[in-house]
Design a protein with these regions (language model features):
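Catalytic core of Fe(II)/2-oxoglutarate
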Residues: 247
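Charge-rich, well-structured scaffold segments of protease-associated domains
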Residues: 32, 40-190, 196-197, 206, ...
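Short amphipathic
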Residues: 201-209
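Active/ligand-binding-proximal structured segments within catalytic/core domains
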Residues: 1-46, 219, 229-242, 250-256
Length: 403
């Protein structure tokens, strides 16, 4: 069984100087509580039959996750609910987790893709701070800040959950009873997502790092609205065609020419905008060639240069990937949680194959063009290539927004 419990309680809800409050709260909450008043003892009881627990904090949310064997679902769920509803937030455990979070932030700061992504996000007008900034701000946070943030955010209407596993009627009834009786305040409503308005960057984001031999880059483009379900499906399919396999149009071509080891792209959303991004780590000498392939293949999409066979083959790939994702309880839970925790929409999982089959070439071309039509975009690099070369790379891709 998998239990994911989510609260709209992320960093956007605290003042900038107190940025690390939600993250520290998440670390301390799955610890000492009224039932078991010591963190190590609580974790020992929770995990004694092999259960796994974790939690994560983002700009928007905090999610608590537990996965356990089927035979102990009720015991483990009970412990999770006690941790969420009866935390003690002890001074000594806060001090210990303060040190652990410092170590976590220091480790994260070595992830160059993450560093560039955060610098890009902030430059584009979205809510973000780098890990090094977060480390500096940690000293502003007290255990009282954590307690107050818990009170402001952990109330029943602000909670969402996804539970996956063997769920016969009797078990569903028991779970419903537990959740309906949860000992959290019942007044209020789900906290709203922040309003973020991405903006066009007129120069590249350049993060100098002389220790990096290759350069890391990201391309971000935005449309000033949320995509429809059909548009999202179509954009996901062309994203697969372009970068997600070793035979894809951009990544596959670049690999065939020996230009890059790996490349990624994907979709993301804010409350009122949609984002399509591309990123890779590549040597300076191959960077312009890789970006030329990217630009050329995207222009082909804009002009409708996609064959029916390419679409058919990619649909088959997408169908298989979907089925594979639903083969575990964790995969099934993740399939529901992404959208539900973000905007409250419960997707009909059984319709996904039908949606994939319904994607048309016209939809693909239209949504790909639309993602570049608002001329809101940015380009960023991390490495030691220099600002002049970074600007040259930006100029190499600028034609994508003049179609």
């Amino acid at each position: 069984m998998t239990f994911d419990v989510n609260f709209r309680a992320g960093e956007y809800l605290v003042e900038a100087g107190k940025w690390e409050v939600p993250h520290l709260m998440e670390h301390v909450l799955l610890g000492a509580n009224e039932l078991i008043p010591r963190s190590r003892d609580f974790q020992a009881e929770l995990e004694k039959n092999g259960a796994y627990s974790n939690a994560n904090t983002s700009v928007y949310d905090i999610t608590y996750e537990i996965e356990c064997a089927d035979f102990e679902w009720d015991r483990v769920l009970g412990l999770l609910l006690v941790a969420i509803t009866k935390p003690l937030f002890l001074d000594e455990e806060f001090a210990a987790e303060f040190g652990n979070v410092q170590e976590e932030m220091a480790a994260r700061s070595n992830n160059h893709f993450r560093r560039l992504s955060l610098e890009m996000r902030r430059a584009l007008g979205l809510i973000a701070k780098t890990d090094s900034e977060r480390l500096e701000l940690m000293a502003n946070v007290t255990v009282d800040d954590v307690r107050q943030h818990y009170i402001r955010t952990h109330f029943a209407p602000n909670m969402r959950f996804v539970i996956a596993g063997n769920l016969p009627a009797s078990r569903r009834a028991s779970i419903n009873k537990l959740l309906e009786a949860i000992d959290l305040p019942k007044k209020g409503r789900r906290l709203a997502l922040p309003i973020e308005r991405p903006k066009r960057l007129n120069r590249p984001v350049y993060v100098a790092n002389d220790t990096v031999e290759n350069l890391y880059f990201y391309i971000d483009t935005f449309i000033k609205r949320r995509l429809s379900e059909a548009e999202t499906d179509a954009l996901s399919l062309i994203n697969t065609i372009l970068t997600e396999t070793l035979y894809s149009k951009i990544f596959g071509t670049a690999r065939e020419r020996g230009l890059v080891y790996g490349m990624n792209s994907g979709l993301s959303y804010t409350r009122s905008a949609s984002n399509w991004w591309f990123g890779a780590q590549v040597s300076d000498k191959n960077a312009r060639a890789l970006l030329k392939i990217t630009v050329d293949e995207l222009h082909k999409v804009f002009s409708g240069d996609i064959t029916d066979d390419e679409i058919k083959v990619t649909k088959q790939y997408a169908l298989g990937r979907f089925q594979r994702s639903a083969q575990t309880v964790g995969g099934t839970a993740a399939g529901y949680a992404g959208r539900y925790f973000f905007d409250g929409e419960i997707e009909n999982y059984y319709r996904v194959p039908e949606r994939i089959r319904a994607i048309t070439k016209r939809q693909i071309v239209e949504v790909a063009r639309a993602m570049f039509a608002d001329n809101i975009w940015g380009f960023g690099t991390l490495g030691n290539c220099g600002e002049v070369f970074a600007e040259q790379l930006r100029e190499d891709i600028a034609s994508l927004w003049s179609t």
